[in-house]
């Protein structure tokens, strides 16, 4: 199928239905009026000597992929998207193929992996993610679409996130990931719903802790222990529904009982001086906010989700280049199908973060 790689399609999508992303829309109009494109076709940036020498590294981020796996629901038929799995495959292939070039140390998936916790959807996700096996280590978090699906006669074909049941553990079993050197542990001990992983890059130790959508109190208690016990690691928190595009942490929503984004911040994130970032999806759009934790450490909270764009996201992803010598994390939003970057202020930005200089 042909793809229209220009800003006009994005503006049409943003207009009307996507009022939730007003500021990027107006910025887009301004950019076009000034003769600038919303997109930028350019060489992969930050392809520097620091990356080649291991003095800098990259974290890859996959936002919601639910539409890429949706082959059966009424919503997909309504939008006329058809089978979109190729976009998921293009994402993971691109990450695999650019692992050495960008020194990609790890990949995270922000949840809503599938649309309605259906086996046929999980089979697509498994095939897409397996492209990374043995090449790029990764972890995933559960979104509301990944659990608790109940059939119903509505436009979505059912209700999602009503409980904690999920097929995730069948297709991404704990025992598979427990064999990997980056594996740290899970909660509950016999399931993969919540997990933590660790890796070293550019002379620093990092820990990624993945929390279920609306993590329960017992999950946050476990997470507090993991982070406290690994105080020498720099920690990134991965959870699905945490913050909206208005930069407010979630205070409600969804049927499953558990902690909101604000409660997760209060009960867990802000308590630890080694937590410096939270990554989330769920809400269509982009947003960043930075707050000080209880120990004065700055915590960057970053939302990215492109399911509202054409073809359920059309393979837009993020990657973050950690540059210790500059004490910066450089964030890029890239489309491997179009070979283009989004150059909106909310899409391409730098985050300050003190790191050990990699000599």
For each of these PLM feature ranges, what is it?
Residues 41-120, 359:
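N-terminal active-site segment of His-dependent metallophosphoesterases
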Residues 47, 77-78, 118-221, 271, ...:
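Extended active-site neighborhood of metal-dependent phosphoesterases/phosphodiesterases
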Residues 53, 318-359:
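A short C-terminal boundary segment appended to hydrolase-like catalytic domains
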Residues 55-58, 101-106, 133-139, 201-207, ...:
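Loop/turn elements at helix/coil->beta-strand transitions in domains of secreted/extracellular proteins
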Residues 61-63, 106-112, 137-143, 211, ...:
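Active-site neighborhood of phospho(di)ester-bond hydrolases with catalytic His/Asp-centered motifs
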Residues 80, 218-221, 228-276:
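Active-site-proximal segments of metal-dependent phosphoesterases and phosphodiesterases across multiple
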Residues 256-325:
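Conserved beta-sheet core of the metallophosphoesterase superfamily
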């Amino acid at each position: 199928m042909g793809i229209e790689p220009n800003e006009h399609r994005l503006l049409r999508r943003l207009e009307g239905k996507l009022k939730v992303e007003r500021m990027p829309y107006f910025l887009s109009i301004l950019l076009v009026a000034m003769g600038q494109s919303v997109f930028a076709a350019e060489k992969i940036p930050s392809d520097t000597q620091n990356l080649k020498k291991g003095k800098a590294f990259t974290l890859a981020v996959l936002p919601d992929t639910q539409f890429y796996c949706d082959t059966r629901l009424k919503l997909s038929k309504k939008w006329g998207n058809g089978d979109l799995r190729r976009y998921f495959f293009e994402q993971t292939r691109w990450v695999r193929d650019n692992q050495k070039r960008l020194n990609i140390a790890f990949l995270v998936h922000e949840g809503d992996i599938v649309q309605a916790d259906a086996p046929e959807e999980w089979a697509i996700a498994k095939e897409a993610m397996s492209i990374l096996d043995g090449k790029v280590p990764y972890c995933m978090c559960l979104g509301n679409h990944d659990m608790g699906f109940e059939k119903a006669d509505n436009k979505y074909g059912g209700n999602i996130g009503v409980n904690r049941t999920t097929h995730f553990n069948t297709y991404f079993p704990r025992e598979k990931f427990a064999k990997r050197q980056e594996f740290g542990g899970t909660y509950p001990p016999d399931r993969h719903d919540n997990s933590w992983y660790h890796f070293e890059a550019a002379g620093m130790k990092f820990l990624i802790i993945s929390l279920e959508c609306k993590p329960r109190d017992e999950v946050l208690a476990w997470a507090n222990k993991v982070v406290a016990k690994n105080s020498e690691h720099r920690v990134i928190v991965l959870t699905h529904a945490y913050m909206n595009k208005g930069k407010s942490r979630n205070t409600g929503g969804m049927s499953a009982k558990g902690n909101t984004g604000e409660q997760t911040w209060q009960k867990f994130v802000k308590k630890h001086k080694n937590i410096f970032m939270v990554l989330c999806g769920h809400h269509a759009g982009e947003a960043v906010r930075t707050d000080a934790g209880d120990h004065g450490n700055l915590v960057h909270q970053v939302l990215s989700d492109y399911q509202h764009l054409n073809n359920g996201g059309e393979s837009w992803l993020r990657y973050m280049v950690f540059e210790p010598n500059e004490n910066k994390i450089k964030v890029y939003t890239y489309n491997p199908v179009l070979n283009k970057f989004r150059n909106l202020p909310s899409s391409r930005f730098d985050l300050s973060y003190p790191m050990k200089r990699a000599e």
